[in-house]
Amino acid sequence: MAYQNFNMDHQWLPFTPNRSFAKDPRIFVAADGMHFTTHDGKQVLDAISSLWCVGAGHNRKPINEAIKKQLDTLDYATAFQASNDKAFRAAEMIAAMAPGDLNKVLFCNSGSEAADTSMKVALAYHRARGEGHRNVFIGREKGYHGVGFGGMSVGGIQIGRASCRERVLVQV
């Protein structure tokens, strides 16, 4: 289905009934502060900070400038057998704020990756302690933990969970 100046047939939206969406789409074309602007000029409050990814708001000038400055210096560096100075500084700052002896930081690219990685870390931790039998996860009804297999397996949103839960994590 063509919509405005683009074709909506090629993007698959997670946790979204895509055919229904195509009939009455919500298309955002801009964002500033706490609001989106739709293709037809309406303002929409982003009450969930775009799934908690923009807690400081959209299009914040100081954040935009810091990102641009960093992009001009180093856009990305893998954490596989290498790292970068900013990652070490950020890890140190986060560790200083964490309670007790929680002083290790593993950076992930998204909440979905963080959910899946935390599950792998929990399984590895118990296995290393000789308690590999501790492999049951508890999820919340209607809980959202991302679009990765682990997050969907422990999540409670039925539209996504049904397709992978029994194949990936049986004991949820």
Name these PLM-found stretches:
Residues 14-15, 19, 47-61:
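Glycine-rich phosphate/pyrophosphate-binding beta-alpha loops
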Residues 2-8, 72-106:
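Cysteine/selenocysteine-centered motifs that mediate thiol-based redox chemistry or coordinate metal-sulfur cofactors
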Residues 169-172:
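Cysteine-centered metal-binding/redox modules
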Residues 1-35, 82, 87:
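Active-site-adjacent loop/helix segments that line or gate small-molecule/cofactor pockets in enzymes
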Residues 32, 47-48, 140:
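A secondary-structure boundary/capping signal
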Residues 27-37, 53-69, 80-92:
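A structural motif shared across PLP-dependent enzymes of the aminotransferase-like
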Residues 92-167:
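PLP-dependent aspartate aminotransferase-fold enzymes
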